[in-house]
Amino acid sequence: MSLTTLCREKCREKKEQMSKTTFLIGCTHFGHDKMYKFVDYNGKKIRPFENAKEGDAVMLERWNSVVGVDDKVYVLGDVAFTSESLSILKKCNGKKILIQGNHDNLSVSEYMKYFKDIRSSHKLDGEILSHIPIHPNSLWRQKKNTNWLNIHAHLHNQTVSLAQADPDTEQGSIADMERIHGIEPKKDPRYFSVCVERIGYKPISIDGIRNLTNPKSVV
């Protein structure tokens, strides 16, 4: 192979890599009918669909409307409760990596049918991916004098609030009272939830998240 051909090949590979997008999504709970019966503090259903069949169909359609076959998708846990429900991932575009959640209790071999890798957490350029939100004391980046952004799932339609992260308050009490009275608590900018209830039931790109967040702006 000539030097010119080699350079062209490297440029082509670089362009292909740049054209691929990284997406994130969490807490799909495919096939989990009980999820569609849960209600919030105000008695409103957490998910606006009748059952898992309807919800799964919507999530599949929306997933493939934004994710291409060569895109990367980090799934931040609680994918499905059964092997049968997990098989919907065959129809979901993208090369998938699982950040394991507390309800992902099937065998590793089951998950490896659909995922390229399984991890407990993962770091990107400025972001830590986890299922459960990481303790705020672990988000400070001393060398860079800034915070990690924790992209997480687990909380469904709720978010990590500044009240919950403040050690001088009773944990969660202020945020809970605000929610009971229909007030959205002030979000902690060090956290971003990719639970389907928070992102329109479809994966969101990492660039989209970065455009919406500023983990430096913290108390």
Where are the regions that the model predicts?
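Extended recognition/assembly regions associated with phosphoester-bond processing machinery
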Residues: 2-76, 80-219
